[in-house]
Every structure is written in structure tokens, then in C-alpha cells.
Amino acid sequence: EMIFKVLFKVDCRINTEAVSISPKNKTVDLKNVETGEQTTESYDKLVLSPGAPSIKPPLPGIDLPGVFSVRTVPDARKIREWLEKGTGFLAGMNRYSGFQTVRPKTRAVIVGGGFIGIEVAENLVHRGFDVQLIQRGDQVLTPLDREMARVVEGFLGDHGVKVNLNDEAVGFKKLETGALEVQTKSGQTYPADVVILGIGVRPDTKLAAAAGLKVGKLGGILVDAQMKTSDPDIFAVGDAIEVKHYVTGEQSLIALAGPANRQGRIAADVIAGKDSKFRGTQGTAIIGLFGAAAAWTGVSEKNLNQMGEKDYEKVFLYPNSHAGYYPGASPIAIKIIFRKSDGKLLGAQALGKDG
């Protein structure tokens, strides 16, 4: 707070919720979540950046202790505190305490095979956990095409993550032992000491919609190229907005840090009088997993088939990460998708341990 105030002259108010906006009066009603005190602030220009909270479906037992969603740093801290309650210096061993046996927490179930699910799975493996990952679809990392995702799934399996595809969690139960049980649509059950939900995010548009701002078909706040909403004095940036996909030209929800950073800078430029515009995003992303990486940009072959696009071709390449006459080179699997009629690059995906 002090850094923002001293260096940037920004009045940063933590523990404060914006509860409503009045575009007509150009005011925002605020509430201190600790004291309940309510205040009103006026604005000339307003920027909304509410983000996209984790999806938490109304499943039986989803609010049980030990079942977590993870999206923010405080979320991660809560999970770490929960894990450390039952580990201690005797992790991996049972110990007798009073009239009960205290068993370290060593079993984890991850629900969801996207960014968050895979990164949490890796970290729990490093902590010595037995990890089960449940994915509703037929592959992890849905932006990848299936043949590329299969490589990722094999790599996860090689490092101890048990990947369960085409299944989904339908409920959670606390057992007499104190452990949790994850119940799935297939009828399979998984015992767990901790359950992490990583089943996606949804744009937070409640405040914007209540203020009468337009929301798109995909559920995000609609903005123009200068990040202005349907009210020219209210801007919106980040995971809560719909943006143009640079390759397809269609509206998309792209919850990535890179585009959000650029959108914030463009909104600031426009407010300051500079004619800046957001050209769209390619959805470029990368994820590390057990010393390797998976990356993608543009559209996948799967996307093109869903769009009914036939004018494309693909090529697979397997170069080394560096010149073969230097030691330590490892192969990189690359898939490139391009338009046949003019050779325009439409998308690319890459997997490898180096390079």
C-alpha cells in the first residue's frame, strides 16, 4: 500500500469491496469488508478489473474441510497450511498421539487437467504425495490437439501422476477415518487427504451487469479496441472481458497474464489521452511440468474442425533443442498448422525438455 502511495500516488484500499456503480452519477459505492463501513467515491474515468474466479459447482460435500479451489496466493497459502497440519517431521510414518493414530496427509486428488490442475499436481508430487488427476474430457490441456496432449499425459504418468480421463467428480464425502472420498460419475471412488479443484474460471461480471454494461455471449464484459465498455467513461481489462482472437477474428475469453497486462496499459494510455488500441490476442501460453514445457499459440486443429474450416494443413517437426554436435541435446515435438491457400500460419504447439 505504502509503495503505491509513495511511488505512484495511488490510494490503494485493501479489504474494500465495490458493491455498486452508478454510471449516471459517476459514483462507486464501497464497503469495508472488515468494519462494514460504507462510503461513496466519484470518478471521471473508471477501470474494472474484477478477474475470473474459480468455478465451484454445487456438488455434495464441496465445502468440506480439505476441499479447495486455487486461484489466488491466499488460496495457495490455505492449502499449504492444511497440508502442513498432518505432515510434520515424521511425514511418511504413522505416529501415536493420545488415543488416535495421526497419519500424515499423503494422498491428493486433483479435479481438472488444465493449467492449475497440472501445476498443483507437479508440486504435490514433489512433496511426496500420491496424486490422482481426474479430467472430464478425453485429454488434459484442452488448447492442445489430442496427439500432443497424449505426450503430456504420458509425461505426467512417468512422474507418478495417475491421469483419469473421461470422468468427473460428482460429490465429496468425509470418511470415518477423517479422510475424504471423491465420488465420480463412473462410480469410481478415490480416497484423499486433500482435494484441489481446478475446473476452470468464469468472468466476474456481476458489478458490470448490475451497472447496465453490456455483457457478451461468452459471458465476458464487452469492450472496444480501446478497452471502453458500453459506457465510454468505464473501461474494463483482464480475465473478465471478451477479446478478439487475432487469428479467427472471433470473440474469445483468454484468461492469461500477458494480454491482461497489455490491456491495462492500453486503458491507461487512452485515459491519459493517447490513441492506443488492442489488436487482439493469439492466446499464446506455456506451462512447465517436471522440467519440461508445453506451449501453444493461435488455433489448434481441433478448433479449426469445430469451425468447419477445411483450408488448412499441418506438419510435425522433431528438431533437437540445439545443434546435435553439442552434447545434451533433446528432441522437441512441434506441430505447425497453416492455411493451404496462402501459407498463413494459424497455430503452433511445442513440447520438450529444453529449447
Predicted segments, located by residue:
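Glycine-rich flavin
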Residues: 1-10, 22-25, 37, 48, ...
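A short alpha-helix-loop-beta-strand transition element characteristic
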Residues: 10, 83-104, 214-218, 274-284, ...
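A Rossmann-like FAD-binding core segment of flavoenzymes
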Residues: 14-34, 41, 125-225
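AMP-binding/adenylate-forming core of the ANL superfamily
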Residues: 28, 33, 46, 193-196, ...
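Glycine-rich dinucleotide-binding loop and its adjacent helix/turn
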Residues: 50-127, 162, 223-225
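FAD-site-proximal beta/loop scaffold in flavoenzymes
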Residues: 63-95, 178-183, 188-266, 270
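Rossmann-like dinucleotide-binding cores of NAD(P)H-dependent redox enzymes
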Residues: 104-109, 115-173, 254-260, 276-303
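Mid-to-C-terminal Rossmann-like scaffold of FAD/NAD(P)H-dependent oxidoreductases
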Residues: 240-354
